[in-house]
From Swiss-Prot:
Name of this chain's protein: Uncharacterized glycosyltransferase MG060 homolog
EC number from the UniProt entry: 2.4.-.-
Domain of life the protein comes from: Bacteria
Transferase among keywords: yes
InterPro entries for the chain: Glyco_trans_2-like, Glycosyltransf_2, Nucleotide-diphossugar_trans
Organism: Mycoplasma pneumoniae (strain ATCC 29342 / M129 / Subtype 1) (Mycoplasmoides pneumoniae)
One Pfam assignment: Glycos_transf_2
Amino acid sequence: MKISVIISTYNCGALIVKALCSLVSNQTPACELEVLVIDDGSIDNTRQIIKKFQAKVSFTLKYFYKKNGNWGSVINYVKENRLANGDWITVLDSDDTLKPNTLNKLANLVEKADYDLVVFDYTKCWKKIKLKIHTYPTWWKNMTRELQKQTPFCIPLGKFLKRNLFYKLPKLKEKVSFQDALYTASSLKLAKKVRHVNQSGGNYHFKRAGNSMSIPWNIKRFSAELDICKDLIRLNAQEIALVHLLRQQFRVQLKEKQIQLAVTRDFNFSGFSWYTRCFLWMVYQTMLKRYFYLQTTKQ
């Protein structure tokens, strides 16, 4: 089985070493590893670091340099040039790492059943705090219903797509942030069979300087968040759009600009775990309901 790992990087030469080392420790006879480093216009020493690694590792490590266009442009670049040749494809940010044995666990799973998408839990790291995030309830394994497949934890880390699913994904927007949420939501919508693994597949470094979560709340960030919410609603994932409104600064600007988001159905949290369902229902009723309105369709 061949696995393609896409590493999106921009001026992260000091951090990408850990990401690459985590792949070295994941090598297994069950998997042929192909690593594609897509440099989104860095001006640091990323190229030199990758060149040194290419001489040391036993797996395929390719480096591509492109003009800066943000995260969505990296995925578009890989798809347009058909760079990922693995049976399974995943995306790893340059400041994140895979947990040991993740690829071996994946290989054992997909050998036994025909899945389109395998979703691991992950560990959220912030300063000295490490917290395991359960992407789905611990007892959920196989998801087929559309609303059941939704998850508010929509980073690409630990999500492995079959190659044909990856290349079916719609083109992402470029030169804007937060396209990873749309990437994940589109993957979940198109996947027929989703398998959840109740095991952390990697470490996600939250609010690292320079990543999208550390961007200040200016008009550009507000517009990007608003567009993502509208796109998620179009994907019938309005419950995930609602999660974006948990950010206070986003709500403040929506209120100032008197913006409401149109939805075409009532909110349904039945696909979430009971504790997430209770929390989202409560905050929707008490805080967030005012930011949405039900748009009736004409007969």
